[in-house]
Amino acid sequence: MRTRKNRARDAKIRLGDSMATMMKERLACTVAIAALVIGCVTFFYLGLGLVPVYIVGGPGLLAVFFWYRTYLKQPTDPAIIVPLFLITAAGFEIHLVEEYLGHYAPTISRLFNIGWTDRVFVVICFLLAAALCLVSVGLYYRKAVAGFVASLFLFTRLAEVGLFVFPLLRPALQPDVAHPISQSVASGTFVGDMPNHYWRITGSYYFPGMYTVALAILPALYTLYRVWQARPSVTTASVSQ
């Protein structure tokens, strides 16, 4: 009888130790990811200004919280997240085509006096497409890091609403000149053919990517909703009922 009690007690101790170790690992992973996001935002801020803080900073911290509450505790079923993630990625790639054709990078350069060129934009787009393919594989195999990168990608898509604000902002470089300009920006990079989409000067309310932005935002919102609904607490509650 004592042997059974001892075994049960030992099993409880091992289970408690295992759960404590798991919680420590999760916390350490979360802290490391949060530090990485803050470090990257700081690095890009020093080189490019406030734009990366808006695009990556806020969404990045939200992604850390979301990932911790959902995917890190229990990876989302690949049957749920992988198709939705790929649909979002496809819509985003179509959205990038409009941005490229509208010279999004030079327009941003003129707006904020930073060194983004069409060439850099294309390189980033190709690298991002490759990264999204790898992330989808990681989601299929339920990898925690893939879950975070997917969360970051989805939340940064919500930052696309800034496209509706940018036409209202006065450009940092020659705001009163309607035609494209070519010059060196604050970082010393030469950027050619920087359009002006300031609505007070052009008379039109548009910014590159505005027409197709819904293709990136709506699937991202739905994916976040489905992942949140599938989080462990909701699943457990539904099973107990």
Task: Label each PLM-derived region with a short phrase.
Residues 57-69, 126-133, 211-226:
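Hydrophobic cores of alpha-helical transmembrane segments in multi-pass inner/ER membrane proteins
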